[in-house]
């Protein structure tokens, strides 16, 4: 570039000449009144145990919206701002002391009504936020029992139903929405995909008699650049009443009643430990833990590619401690079952090839920890 170019241009050394004029300043203001109302009641003689508490709460929650990263012209349209998230939450439960104080049981049921639930996706290599409406209902149970002076068990159970309400959204992984009348075309200039009518594209290819038509994908994906010939063929059909034969973003997919991301219907954990005195201020604890998680989806579109299979994990440890000396030694094993299960994943956008980045359970590990306190 010419080093003496106008203000706002770069020279060949990468230095900016003069002042750079950025785009318009984006502003957003969000505010809401929130609150929480509830009660708790110790049942006494009316409860299943002498120490049982019943509680119930109603609350109104709020999380402010924000501003999405700017997008280049000609790419998938993204709203400049995303809306606030609102939640009306209802919860009832009990807390009970069992076995004369040797045990504890907590039970809770809840229902969350979300308006504008904020979800993230990747567009043009940037993380953007969108809003959906959702309903979440669930049940949780916690149980602990010191069965003897040396042995205790604890367990938790979670049951969850987290689904979207009636709505349609654009899936960047399936921009045609499964409609065979539309094709995905990649614009080499922007590396983004767009959607054009199958009939229009086939007519265009037939009109060129198989010869190369330079810049065709870019022209298809940027309808304002279409010349008369291209417009004639691509204009044969429209998507969502858009012209020419183009739905730049794609065909929305019905996600009504789909599961929310990373919301398994069942989770379960079980743990047990045995503690024993060894003499001379030394004690030892042997502990084992097991965790199970049901199937879930990584995206709200609930495709087979979004599914994360159920998985389980087990850990074990053996520790020795001397309280008087402030010394502790622990031997442990993580991922005892040596399971290579995927625990989470996310999908990128078309500019990076729509690849999926996955996160695996860490491989089996053996280790020793030594601690000293003064």
Ranges and model annotations:
Residues 42, 53-63, 81-168:
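Membrane-embedded beta-barrel scaffold of Gram-negative outer-membrane proteins
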Residues 1-49:
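Signature of Gram-negative outer-membrane beta-barrel scaffolds
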Residues 58-64, 71, 98, 109-115, ...:
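Transmembrane beta-strands of outer-membrane beta-barrel pores
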